[in-house]
């Protein structure tokens, strides 16, 4: 495909040549005296979509042009289109209001591209979301009102965007066959018949995408929405739009379950088993009947929800070192510092230890089976004993050291903590990690500088047979870095670097070897097999501030959405990654 330039227009016709030149010039040079919106318009068959595709291809090769996010508006409502844009921007799937808030605080000048605006809208005809105008009023309009946002929009009509004096680039009708009708093909009545039988696994992509649109036209939407098989395989945009209709009588927990799962379900390229696993995870702890129905298909995925406590909002989480043959115990702290011990097997509450003086947890690390290291949101470290046993000397040494350092230099404020059987790690706002030997804390920490900005997460793993310790950090620079005591050096390149921020880390020595779990701010968990460098990505329906991985493949996540436990089939995970 030829790159559109001033001298080589990307589509036939004088209008396309003029539009190509004008668009490239506008995109490359943002100026206060220029419009902040461009509308690509023209009749059906004018080649608007092809024109934009060529522009996007050219922008990737032009250092003066950066398109930060592209949204495909056909068949979308404001909420699902916002999820698309949020993912491309590195924020993750955010609803329109939160996306607008994030962009308002984003220091970048941002360029967005939206295709097929005139074909946006989904769901029951009597709801505003069925119209493209709702996408403008609820999403694109507020985004365009931000001074750092520019936008290129494809639309059959200029007035739909309602932008103030946009640059309008009109295209001539292309030669050859007429393009698709400007009528919305998603919402138009379809002549295709309904699928025979309840097995959605055999349905075509077109049947899955449009089944609910047809059911709305025939008055059978409720029957489809109460079919768990359709919820696994159906259109995320169509289901999200239709569930907004409160006149539809549906099972009591369905809307809550779907609202939890839908942002993660909207990630492209998910396998059927992964969609089932996500929906099963959202139903676990909310709708036992639906969760049990989905469990057989969910268990064909390499990751499955074990248990979930969605009402148990938590600020920090740690797994206690225990007898390997035992069931294991996780300790969670809520936003007021109150502690609860949970069984790793089923999540049941085992105890509620007194945490002493109220505090505001930022992180927890297990130093011993009876004592945790707590990091307050103010940056103060303190031991958190679970029993009346004496606080270990290692906890006293490192808390005194770092709290004194913080008083002397606020830049040394701890930002993350982690611990293993032999070492504890304290990270700070200067990008450093202080590695403490727990059996000889009087020798002081070893300090390693891994980032040039604050550390957001840290994890350490003792490897006794190798006589080494692995240290992994995540930073505000969007990188994850690995340091190995065997070489006393960090890897020259990050393990991973993304637009999103690493918010929590888990590191464990498993039967498959050392495995690293990284929770990202865009609702993804990345699992790294460190020996082979293989990566498996899990979209998660939950927001998590804390993450823990155990040697037997239990992955725990905690945050404002509660506490959630996953079973990882590590052998299958790497086989399919």
Region locations from a protein language model:
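Conserved P-loop NTPase "ATPase switch" module shared by AAA+ and STAND
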Residues: 102-133
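Conserved nucleotide-binding/hydrolysis micro-motifs of P-loop NTPases
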Residues: 75-77, 119, 157-160, 175-177
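Conserved RecA-like ASCE ATPase "motif II neighborhood" in helicase/translocase motors
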Residues: 95-100
